[in-house]
């Protein structure tokens, strides 16, 4: 659940940071597993910085899908979420960031939106980003334009991470960032000596998919998950009017 303060800040800014969700032991396990995959060094472009497939790397990763502290926040923002896509990011010192993107007026506007009607939020795709290493002030990492999820004007094409309106969100290892994809966001070039590591889960409303190609979940993975986690892997659909939206999950 969101506290009253967190709910206010999410509506105001488009994001909220949950502090110290993972403890040092959990962080160590996740990072050791990543190290053991012998992934190629991260490159200069975003395409060369991402990795995926980690849901097949064991409970240290699958447990993040519906983490007891984070998932109630997700279901507050998306009463019937589905996992639309997921990936990790690794950056080394000197690698470039990702340009500002997102927003209801951009190409992704059909899936990334924010509305508020009759006292209730209606969110499009919600991203949950787990910081596996420190991303502190001056080091680089996630940046955004707070409040832009409610903007009625397109993002100025000339703006990048140096624009005055752009805000860096510092995170310590173990923190979790939850944000609406309609908020303009991007990545500041990485300056720290250590590797930036994050894993991201993008949850969509249950009837919505970002791409016409859905993730192909292996039967072996499905069988290893709890009923609630399996429900997150369902394809998009609209509920019949008689169905209770809360039935999708084992609470």
Please place each PLM-identified region on the residue numbering.
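Active-site rim elements
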Residues: 58-61, 164-165, 186-188
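Short Ser/Thr-interspersed hydrophobic loop/turn segments at strand-loop and sheet-helix junctions
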Residues: 135, 180-183
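Catalytic core of non-heme Fe(II) oxygenases with the double-stranded beta-helix
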Residues: 95-170, 208-213
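Non-heme Fe(II)-dependent double-stranded beta-helix
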Residues: 1-13, 18-119
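Non-heme Fe(II)/2-oxoglutarate
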Residues: 73, 176, 183-184, 188-251
């Amino acid at each position: 659940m969101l506290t009253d303060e967190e709910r206010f800040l999410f509506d105001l800014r488009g994001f909220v940071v949950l502090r110290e969700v993972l403890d040092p032991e959990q962080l160590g396990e996740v990072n050791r597993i990543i190290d053991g995959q012998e992934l190629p060094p991260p490159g200069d472009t975003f395409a060369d910085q991402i990795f995926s497939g980690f849901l097949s790397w064991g409970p240290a990763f699958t447990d993040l899908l519906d983490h007891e502290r984070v998932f109630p926040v997700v279901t507050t923002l998306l009463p019937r979420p589905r996992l639309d896509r997921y990936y990790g990011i690794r950056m080394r010192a000197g690698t470039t960031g990702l340009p500002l993107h997102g927003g209801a007026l951009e190409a992704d506007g059909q899936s990334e939106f924010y509305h508020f009607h009759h006292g209730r939020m209606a969110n499009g795709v919600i991203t949950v980003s787990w910081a596996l290493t420190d991303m502190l002030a001056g080091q680089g990492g996630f940046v955004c334009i707070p409040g832009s999820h409610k903007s009625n004007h397109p993002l100025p094409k000339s703006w990048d991470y140096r624009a005055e309106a752009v805000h860096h969100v510092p995170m310590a290892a173990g923190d979790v960032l939850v944000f609406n994809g309609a908020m303009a966001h991007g990545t500041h070039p990485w300056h720290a000596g250590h590797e930036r590591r994050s894993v991201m889960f993008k949850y969509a409303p249950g009837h919505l998919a970002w791409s016409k190609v859905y993730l192909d979940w292996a039967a072996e993975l499905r069988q290893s998950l709890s009923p609630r986690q399996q429900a997150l892997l369902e394809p998009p659909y609209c509920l019949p009017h008689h169905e209770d939206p809360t039935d999708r999950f084992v609470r």
